[in-house]
């Protein structure tokens, strides 16, 4: 078999920042991460540590690293979210070539929601609403997570930042 796999990656700091913002936006919903008695998950840094070791993010990052270690990445087309937002047509042309299908010009200012998800199944992190216009969200991870937590994320995932050429 010769499977063709496409994986979009994103700066892990931005992913954890997004999760932290969802956590803060929903103080009335218990995502089972914070335990005041045990004093776990009560700080941003602790929550990032928990997310980095559990589903969905931690598991995915660990499996991605294992795939690369086993050299299974040779048949994968990787896109960085940040690059895709800057040059979507260029990336889509590569995608169409990868799948050996005829290119279709997309309208990045009129994106339609064609799928539906049961967001309630994902708790506070379930947000599968597609924006109608392709725009990169601002990099606010230093403000949301703090510099120390951002540095820890990079240090603990150096392979990720090197492999995908994040600075």
Predicted segments — roles?
Residues 1:
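Active-site periphery "cap/insert" segments of enzyme catalytic domains
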Residues 23, 27-29, 51, 66-70, ...:
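PAPS-dependent sulfotransferases, especially Golgi type II membrane carbohydrate sulfotransferases
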């Amino acid at each position: 078999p010769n499977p063709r796999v496409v994986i979009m990656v994103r700066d892990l700091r931005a992913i954890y920042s997004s999760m932290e913002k969802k956590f803060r936006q929903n103080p009335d919903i218990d995502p089972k991460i914070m335990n005041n008695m045990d004093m776990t998950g009560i700080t941003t840094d602790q929550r990032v540590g928990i997310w980095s070791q559990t589903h969905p993010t931690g598991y995915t990052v660990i499996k991605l690293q294992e795939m690369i270690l086993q050299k299974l990445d040779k048949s994968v087309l990787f896109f960085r979210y940040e690059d895709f937002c800057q040059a979507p047509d260029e990336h889509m042309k590569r995608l169409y070539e990868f799948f050996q299908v005829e290119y279709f010009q997309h309208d990045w200012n009129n994106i339609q929601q064609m799928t539906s998800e049961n967001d309630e199944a994902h708790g506070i992190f379930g947000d599968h609403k597609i924006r109608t216009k392709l725009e990169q969200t601002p990099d606010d991870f230093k403000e949301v997570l703090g510099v120390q937590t951002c540095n820890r994320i990079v240090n603990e995932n150096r392979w990720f930042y090197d492999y995908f050429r994040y600075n």
